[in-house]
Amino acid sequence: DTLRSMQRGNLKGFEAMIDGVEEPKELNRQMGTMFQAFFPQLNYPIIPEYKFKSSANGIAILDGADSKLKSFAEQELDYSIDKGLDIIAKVDKKYVIGEAKFLTDFGGHQNAQFKDALTLVDDYDSPKATAIAILDGVLWIKSKSKMFLTVSKKEKSILSALLLGEFLE
């Protein structure tokens, strides 16, 4: 919006810079942090790596930011995609890795975010973990949109965050 305003001549110089700095992050770019804040509601232990690696009973979630999760996945789960992860869970001795996105609209940057999440389920190919795309927002509206048609036809693990607990069980 700020860029468009500048192009129309409504904002200039310092004023435009201040507006751009004060502009909040898009909601979909905050999803990873918001998603991790959702974990305690699942009532699974969120544990550090040294405990996570040795856990073998029940469900646990690895504690850490996306870069730490990515590093763990690279070292332990044959992960080689150049993207951080939003969740690594362990169900008994089986690992689950996931990318979370909240899509607020169709088209543009939202399509790129959608494709980003699907990259994980399409490209990760290791018996060491199950890859999931955790997607919420407009893509679940039954329509002829590319997003809805894609998730309806894909035979991959794509789900809403609201179903994550059920999926892990």
Regions found by a protein language model. Give the residues of each.
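Active-site glycine- and acidic-residue-rich loops that bind
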Residues: R29, L77-Y79
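Domain-level recognition of nuclease-like catalytic cores that cleave nucleotide substrates
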Residues: I132-E169
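Interdomain/boundary linker segments immediately adjacent to catalytic/signaling cores
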Residues: D1-G58
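Catalytic cores of nucleic-acid endonucleases
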Residues: F102-K146
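Glycine-rich, often proline-containing surface loops adjacent to acidic residues and nearby aromatics
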Residues: N10-M17, K93-K101
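Surface-exposed cleft-lining segments at the edges of enzyme active sites
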Residues: A16-E23, G58-E76, A100-G108
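Active-site beta-strand-loop-beta-strand hairpin of nuclease catalytic cores
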Residues: S80-I97
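Generic recognition of flexible, low-complexity loop/linker segments
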Residues: E74-E76, G84-D86, V121
